[in-house]
Amino acid sequence: MITSVYAKIEYVTNTKMLFVANNWGYWVNVKPNSGFSRTDNNVLVFLHELTFLAQNNAINKELYAFKSLKEKEWFKALLTINGIGPKTAMNVMVNKQEEVLTLIKNNDLNGLLRLENINKKVATMLLASDIASKHYLKNQIVVSDKVEPQIDDDEKIDDSKDLNDDELLSEIVIEAIDCLISLGYKQEQIKTALAEIDLKNESINDSADLVAVIIKQIGLRTSEVS
């Protein structure tokens, strides 16, 4: 699971971007006016992966790219709001995070409606949430953007430089649980399945792998009961 890379931007539009890192090309989603440019070389890109179930029951993944960790955490926080998906979250992020949070905290509907890309439906969902007061917003989103040390273009990107194995595994589990809940699985089902799975299994490399294993385990338990 890649959380950040140093990359060369090859192509960027208002919603999509192609970048190259370690001779691999990545086609990712970006917010409007993302701040990325084709002139960017060896720029740090923060990534968030979303896993979803396609119509043919295949598990698909999409990558979302951000200029800072603060942006990435803001995106993840917006996705916790009922009714807000990745496209809407990206559109909300065109506006300054602090301004959006202040308007939500003040219950200012008219103020939200004056912002770009926020209609009455989205504004109502924002106001109905408790996003402005959640603990993780204070501790994760409102952080200073620090300058990261530059590395050579040909240096191999390895997530283990920043996260140890247990931290990576914890993030994989959290993302897998979020995905399964969004697919309609109950927390008790997920918890029971997790207790029966060897999380150190080499076949589990990312959240998509874990989602597939948990779904299979839930299916086995269901067939045993029936």
Swiss-Prot record:
Coiled coil: none annotated. Residues 146-167 are annotated as: Flexible linker. InterPro entries: RuvA, RuvA_2-like, RuvA_C. GO terms for cellular component: cytoplasm; Holliday junction helicase complex; Holliday junction resolvase complex. GO terms for biological process: DNA recombination; DNA repair. One of its GO terms (molecular function) is ATP binding. Residues 68-145 are annotated as: Domain II. It is found in: Cytoplasm. Residues 1-67 are annotated as: Domain I. The RuvA-RuvB-RuvC complex processes Holliday junction (HJ) DNA during genetic recombination and DNA repair, while the RuvA-RuvB complex plays an important role in the rescue of blocked DNA replication forks via replication fork reversal (RFR). RuvA specifically binds to HJ cruciform DNA, conferring on it an open structure. The RuvB hexamer acts as an ATP-dependent pump, pulling dsDNA into and through the RuvAB complex. HJ branch migration allows RuvC to scan DNA until it finds its consensus sequence, where it cleaves and resolves the cruciform DNA. This is Holliday junction branch migration complex subunit RuvA. It comes from Mycoplasmoides gallisepticum (strain R(low / passage 15 / clone 2)) (Mycoplasma gallisepticum).
